[in-house]
C-alpha cells in the first residue's frame, strides 16, 4: 500500500506539521496552540512513491500504528484526535 509522497506531505501539513527544508523535507508538529513540539518525521527529496516499509517507519516516528498514520494523512483522524493521542502518551504537554 505505497502512497504518493506529495499526498503524505499535504496530509501532514493539513494536520499541523510545518515543513522545513534541508537535505530532506522535515515535518515538525506544532500543537493547536502553535507551540513547536519534538514530534517529527521526514521525507526524501528524490522519492515519488513511499514504500510500505517507510510508511511504517514514519508512523513509528509519529507515535502511531501504520493504520493510524494512514488515517492521519488520509483525513479520518483529525488534528485534535492526533493531539489528544500525543497528550495521552505524554509526548506533548
Give the ranges of each region predicted by the language model:
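Short acidic DE-rich linear segments
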Residues: 90-93
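C-terminal structural segments of small proteins and small subunits
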Residues: 61-88
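Charged/polar, solvent-exposed surface patches and flexible loops
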Residues: 10, 14, 60, 71
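A short, structured beta-strand/loop element
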Residues: 19-60
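Amphipathic alpha-helical segments
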Residues: 1-18
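Alpha-helical structural elements
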Residues: 12, 22-24, 64, 77
